[in-house]
């Protein structure tokens, strides 16, 4: 394995606010992708009371080569999860919340109704909190993502993850063009929504392939793109091809803006929900000025 460069070293999680966030998450029986995916930014984010909640349990029905979330037979849905999530948001006084999930291919709707219930419960408690959802692809789940789009979260995020050439290796049970279709249809169903997608670099893709993904996302009218370094969670996961330099990330940011994205987050430690509240405010401001 390549030795990790200095620009990828994050502070160890600690501090009073970090512990308060942890306790609130545990008290309300919630899972977070921050913990399950071993995110390097957990210390920084939780010390700002920012946590990305992972609904539909902690066990995924897929086994993507990049992801650290456990794979297996999932538990039954928790009927109290939406209410518990809303209570935690109120306790943490969140202005912006990101909700993601494991893949639930075992459910007839892929878990779409649980996303909708979470949106509804949050809106019952507060109209001040903006809601960003990061969903799986709902492959072969007719009407699933369409129903969520109609429920009107503020941001609909679905990650493209990597370039199409690497899908068979990195994301074998997903389909690149289905993900593009999802993003395009979400915008058509609810044009008021901001749409967002992200990809990892350092897996063996070329710059030209990344530029093509940018073009594909813009063709789907995606507003916001995130680009971050892939980090190998364990030796059994996909290997890192190389570490992309901060200068290259800046170049990707420049190119993405030139292609028409309203907001671009591109850095080694960028993740889908990293600085999500600040980026949402930038997104809203950029939309207003266009």
Curated annotation (Swiss-Prot):
The GO molecular function terms of this record are:
4 iron, 4 sulfur cluster binding; lipoate synthase activity; metal ion binding
Q: Main EC class of this protein?
A: transferase
User: Quick one: which residues bind [4Fe-4S] cluster 2?
Assistant: 60, 64, 67
| Residues given in the record as [4Fe-4S] cluster 1 binding sites | 34, 39, 45, 273
Give the protein's cofactors: [4Fe-4S] cluster
Relay the cofactor remark from the entry: Binds 2 [4Fe-4S] clusters per subunit. One cluster is coordinated with 3 cysteines and an exchangeable S-adenosyl-L-methionine.
Report the Pfam families cross-referenced here: LIAS_N, Radical_SAM
SMART domains in UniProt: Elp3
Q: Which domain of life is it from?
A: Bacteria
Q: Which family does it belong to?
A: Belongs to the radical SAM superfamily. Lipoyl synthase family.
Protein name as annotated: Lipoyl synthase
Entry EC number(s):
2.8.1.8
* Protein's cellular compartments: Cytoplasm
Task: Identify the metabolic or biological route this protein is part of.
Answer: Protein modification; protein lipoylation via endogenous pathway; protein N(6)-(lipoyl)lysine from octanoyl-[acyl-carrier-protein]: step 2/2
List the catalysed reactions.
Answer: [[Fe-S] cluster scaffold protein carrying a second [4Fe-4S](2+) cluster] + N(6)-octanoyl-L-lysyl-[protein] + 2 oxidized [2Fe-2S]-[ferredoxin] + 2 S-adenosyl-L-methionine + 4 H(+) = [[Fe-S] cluster scaffold protein] + N(6)-[(R)-dihydrolipoyl]-L-lysyl-[protein] + 4 Fe(3+) + 2 hydrogen sulfide + 2 5'-deoxyadenosine + 2 L-methionine + 2 reduced [2Fe-2S]-[ferredoxin]
Q: What are the entry keywords?
A: 4Fe-4S, Cytoplasm, Iron, Iron-sulfur, Metal-binding, S-adenosyl-L-methionine, Transferase
> What's one GO-annotated cellular component?
cytoplasm
**Family annotation (HAMAP family):** Lipoyl_synth
Q: Can you give the residue ranges of the Radical SAM core domain?
A: 46-262
């Amino acid at each position: 394995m390549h030795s990790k460069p200095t620009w990828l070293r994050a502070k160890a999680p600690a501090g009073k606010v970090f512990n308060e966030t942890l306790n609130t998450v545990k008290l309300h029986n919630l899972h977070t992708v921050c913990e399950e995916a071993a995110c390097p930014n957990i210390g920084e984010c939780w010390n700002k009371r920012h946590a990305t909640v992972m609904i539909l349990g902690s066990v995924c029905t897929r086994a993507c080569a990049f992801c650290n979330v456990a794979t297996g037979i999932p538990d039954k849905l928790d009927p109290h999860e939406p209410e518990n999530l809303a209570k935690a948001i109120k306790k943490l006084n969140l202005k912006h919340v990101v909700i993601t999930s494991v893949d639930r291919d075992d459910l007839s709707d892929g878990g779409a109704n649980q996303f909708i219930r979470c949106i509804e419960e949050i809106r019952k408690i507060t109209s001040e909190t903006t809601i960003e959802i990061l969903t799986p692809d709902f492959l072969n789940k007719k009407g699933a993502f369409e129903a969520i789009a109609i429920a009107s979260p503020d941001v609909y995020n679905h990650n493209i993850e990597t370039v199409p050439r690497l899908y068979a290796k990195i994301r074998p049970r997903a389909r690149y063009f289905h993900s593009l279709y999802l993003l395009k249809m979400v915008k058509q169903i609810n044009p008021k929504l901001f749409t967002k997608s992200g990809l990892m670099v350092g897996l063996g893709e070329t710059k030209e392939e990344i530029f093509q993904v940018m073009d594909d996302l813009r063709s789907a009218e995606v507003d916001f793109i995130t680009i971050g370094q892939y980090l190998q969670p364990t030796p059994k996961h996909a290997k890192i091809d190389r570490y992309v330099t901060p200068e290259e990330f800046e170049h990707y940011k420049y190119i993405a803006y030139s292609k028409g994205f309203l907001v671009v987050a591109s850095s080694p430690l960028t993740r889908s929900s990293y600085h999500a509240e600040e980026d949402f405010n930038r997104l809203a401001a950029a939309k207003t000025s266009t």
